[in-house]
Amino acid sequence: KWWPEVSKTLNILRITGGEPLLHKTTWKTFDDLIENPKPQIEININTNMGYTPRRMEKLVDYVTKMRDNNSIKAFKMFSSMDTWGDRAEYLRTGLDIETWEKNQDIYLRGVQSHITHMVTFNILSVTSFKSFLVKILEWRKTYEDIIPNNLGTDENVRKIRFDTPYLKEPIQY
């Protein structure tokens, strides 16, 4: 009920979890954007990428339609990952690292846009964070030439990014 009015002036729509790509209202929102373009809106989505590759292919199709129709300004993907391998699977209940990496590959090759990995440090991830950094370097070698630089410059824009936000204490204290 609120979407038609809010979407007129909204610049960034950030869709977060649970897992947004498992929720039917996410897809309804995408359908609405295709039918009623909002070229000023940038969509940011947080996902754990723990679903079937078929679902990621569906997302790629939707993002492609929204871009081709100028339905949105931009689409940005954010995923949480703190380390790599067995330790990552242990830290994130239900994570299948092979499925996660396949979904990332489908997204990067299909959408040809960057992805940002959000890192949350804890006692188990900080000791193996280097393995994740090594993996990021590997991905950068794989995807840097696949994903175009949309800035219109020769500037090297990282396609595989990671964010390590730092918060000493809650702001209210």
Where are these regions (language model features)?
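Catalytic cores of alpha/beta
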Residues: 123-139
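Catalytic cores of extracellular degradative/oxidative enzymes
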Residues: 9, 29-30
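An active-site-proximal structural segment forming one wall of the substrate-binding cleft
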Residues: 2-3, 108
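Short, acidic, metal-binding catalytic loop of nucleotide-sugar glycosyltransferases
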Residues: 32-37, 110
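Core AdoMet radical
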Residues: 1, 7-24, 36-101, 114-124, ...
